[in-house]
């Protein structure tokens, strides 16, 4: 057991040192404060799919006016038009101009539809960031290590592509999937040695298993590349501060692992834009309150 723990620590250290020198703004040390010993600063982004009925220009305007620092742009999941529109109409220079106009940073492309390869060059030329995708089908507990190793081996070409385009690939946990449980998170971080690969943690799916979100955050550690502030409730109650989950322990855990990305309030469902904006404003304020409460222990 001690050897396994030492191995995990060494692998995590390798991931940290490998990523530190090449990390784009999406995962930069800006999230860690002015110095290694400084207080962790929470940064907020949100996803364009929340405004999928609007153009990408209008979505960026809404997100910026709400005070978010960065954006996660979605491909065609549930018909979201934004990323394909950027690819076909704006291109990397047009996207950079649009984001600069609204003083937004590019955090991520969510590529559940289309895959990373399709958007890798665009992401790199737009400044680099995180590409979020799923894992693979579930497996029996006794098969977990072998299946995770095979899955990560299969991602090596994508990790090389991410390095070429100064980007990162974050694998999201999901119900009924390979990456779904605390044990699967442990297997991922133990086996993964690429600084280009990490985890996109969706607490919604952690909660469905009645597992601890702070524990999941701490297991992921420096391999946590994307964090959804997202709870297991229906409708708008999936959002922070709208649903009942106390996310202060989540924020404290993010600070403990010195999470380098943005905290991304999220929900599935597509209310009218003004309703969505009002709920995201509640989430923004709520997360800031959580950070304030947690900061005593940060």
Model-derived regions, located:
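Charged helix-capping and loop-helix junction motifs
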Residues: 86-93, 144-155, 183, 212-216, ...
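C-terminal helical cap(s) of enzyme catalytic domains, especially alpha/beta-barrels
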Residues: 276-292
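Short, acidic/polar
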Residues: 53-63, 114-123, 211-216
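N-terminal secretory signal peptides and thylakoid transit peptides that target proteins
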Residues: 1-18
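Acidic/histidine-rich catalytic cores of soluble enzymes
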Residues: 70, 160-252
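C-terminal segment of N-terminal export signals and the immediately downstream linker at the start
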Residues: 25-54, 58-62
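Structural motif corresponding to the early beta-alpha repeats
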Residues: 69-158, 163-168, 205, 235, ...
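Conserved, mostly hydrophobic/aromatic
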Residues: 46, 63, 71, 99, ...
């Amino acid at each position: 057991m001690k050897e396994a723990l030492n191995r995990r620590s060494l692998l995590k250290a390798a991931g940290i040192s490998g990523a530190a020198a090449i990390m784009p703004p999406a995962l930069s040390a800006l999230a860690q404060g002015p110095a290694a010993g400084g207080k962790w600063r929470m940064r907020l982004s949100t996803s364009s799919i929340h405004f999928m009925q609007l153009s990408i220009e209008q979505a960026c305007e809404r997100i910026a006016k709400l005070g978010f620092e960065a954006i996660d742009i979605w491909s065609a999941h549930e018909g979201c038009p934004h990323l394909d529109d950027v690819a076909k109409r704006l291109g990397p220079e047009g996207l950079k101009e649009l984001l600069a106009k609204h003083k937004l940073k590019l955090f991520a492309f969510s590529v559940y539809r289309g895959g990373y390869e399709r958007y890798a060059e665009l992401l790199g030329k737009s400044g680099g960031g995180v590409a979020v995708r799923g894992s693979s089908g579930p497996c029996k507990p006794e098969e977990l290590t072998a299946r995770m190793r095979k899955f990560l081996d299969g991602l090596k070409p994508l990790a090389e592509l991410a390095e070429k385009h100064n980007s990162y690939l974050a694998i999201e946990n999901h119900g009924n999937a390979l990456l779904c449980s605390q044990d699967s998170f442990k297997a991922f971080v133990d086996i993964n040695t690429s600084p280009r690969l990490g985890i996109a943690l969706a607490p919604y799916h952690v909660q469905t298993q009645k597992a601890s979100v702070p524990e999941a955050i701490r297991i992921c550690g420096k391999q946590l590349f994307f964090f959804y502030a997202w709870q297991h409730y229906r409708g708008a109650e999936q959002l922070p501060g709208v649903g009942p989950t106390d996310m202060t322990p989540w924020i404290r855990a993010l600070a403990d692992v010195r999470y380098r990305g943005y905290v991304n309030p999220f929900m599935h469902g597509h209310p009218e834009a003004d309703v969505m904006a009002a709920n995201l404003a509640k989430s923004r304020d709520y997360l800031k309150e959580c950070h304030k409460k947690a900061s005593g222990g940060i």
